[in-house]
Amino acid sequence: MEEKSKSRGWCGWFIAIIVLASVILAVVYTVKLRTKKSGDDDGGGPVPGPPGAIDKKYADALKLALQFFDIQKSGKLENNKIPWRGDSGLKDGSEDNLDLSKGLYDAGDHIKFGFPMAFTATVLSWSILEYGDQMNAVNQLDPAKDSLRWITDYLIKAHPSDNVLYIQVGDPKVDHPCWERPEDMKEKRPLTKIDVDTPGTEVAAETAAAMASASLVFKDSDPTYSATLLKHAKQLFNFADTKRGSYSVNIPEVQKFYNSTGYGDELLWAASWLYHATEDKTYLDYVSNHGKEFASFGNPTWFSWDNKLAGTQVLLSRLLFFKKDLSGSKGLGNYRNTAKAVMCGLLPKSPTSTASRTNGGLIWVSEWNSMQQSVSSAFLASLFSDYMLTSRIHKISCDGKIFKATELRDFAKSQADYMLGKNPLGTSFVVGYGDKYPQFVHHRGASIPADATTGCLDGFKWFNSTKPNPNIAYGALVGGPFFNETFTDSRENPMQNEPTTYNNALLVGLLSSLVTTSSTLQSLK
């Protein structure tokens, strides 16, 4: 749990099929992908092909990254693939006659924090929508969709009426003094909710984004479920917008863990996803009309569970790359210009390159969970690069200096490679990947033998053990190194050695973007 004082796949939304050398047929809400228009950076290059050769390194890491979601599942487990996990949290929600047994434990503890869990679902949806063909090429699409549905099943139950959303199961004050397996929990699991008297705009809007994006994922395979998700998304967005108020102001207890710095970004993010899911121009007008109020145009930001602006700007850029009819939405250009500024900040040789970078090349912003910005930045860079290439735009200008779209992809790969072991420490930060990775991950279930029965306190003998975790939390992306590229592998070091589901969702998106090659990128080398 975070304490805060602390495509190159061309499937998903757009499956590019080369029929003639100069013709692209793509499925983007039944509209053809557009080619270069006057004023674009540069165009006329080769067009993308279907997934190509598989990069085993990223394919292996992707399989592991998705496995971490199985490790984090609450509820009655179905087709359980993790031998040291079992059913848990079966009575969650019962005090209000709800079934909140599903969902994911947020990190190494056993709280279900709705705000970052919804963000996890939104990012997983985005990853599937853009890179579903990549995932499918390495047999990981079904596991990704299964994990997403485990979350959205929970979110549906957590929204029992239009203006009520349960946003947390468990109390950190009760949970955190314990060290035990989730299967053995006997402590009370109190519920926290938002409603008209206690609004929480950011968590309601993020949950709306999660449900709207997931409705697209399941639109073809389960249209009834998709329609249910979309109905909830619309209700939650209306609740978020009409009953504005910060959840971390109205519920001060959350401030120590997932404190929000504002809700404007979530409103824009949710409206953007609802437009993609519905093509209802009302939502497009919303992001256009509220851009000056909430979007911080011209000021690049870091994409995270707390700040969705950079993600929103990239997502809305997608419309300008591919959508034909966007009449009356003049404000979208500001979103794409700011997205470009974000990209220019990430390119190492750009005149506006960020200084928030280690000597080894890792994007580094904060000591706590340092890799969140690394993986989120790399994911957005992959997306933007792929949007450019699919649109036959292969250059971007950063203060007059020209960079290729493939250089954004190279940046994304550099971050992924660092996480997988190409770094000064020679260690992988993805548990189970490579020959050297963290052995003492701050994770209760991983640290306690599956056949041990512990209470709240006696489990600390496993926390204090000098032996490595008896269970391997396969696929977990831990917090990451300090700026000086030091890392302490210890259970007592959650700042660096605790994994989170939202980091793993971003990692899944990043690895899915890199898992195969295509004719386009090969031809641009």
UniProtKB/Swiss-Prot annotation:
PROSITE patterns: GH9_1, GH9_2. GO terms for biological process: cell wall organization; cellulose catabolic process. Its main location: secreted. GO terms for molecular function: cellulase activity. It comes from Arabidopsis thaliana. Belongs to the glycosyl hydrolase 9 (cellulase E) family. Coiled coil: none annotated. GO terms for cellular component: extracellular region; mitochondrion; plasma membrane. Glycans are attached at residues 259, 464, 484. The keyword Hydrolase applies. Its EC number is 3.2.1.4. Keywords: Carbohydrate metabolism, Cell wall biogenesis/degradation, Cellulose degradation, Glycoprotein, Glycosidase, Hydrolase, Polysaccharide degradation, Secreted, Signal. This is Endoglucanase 10. It is found in: Secreted.
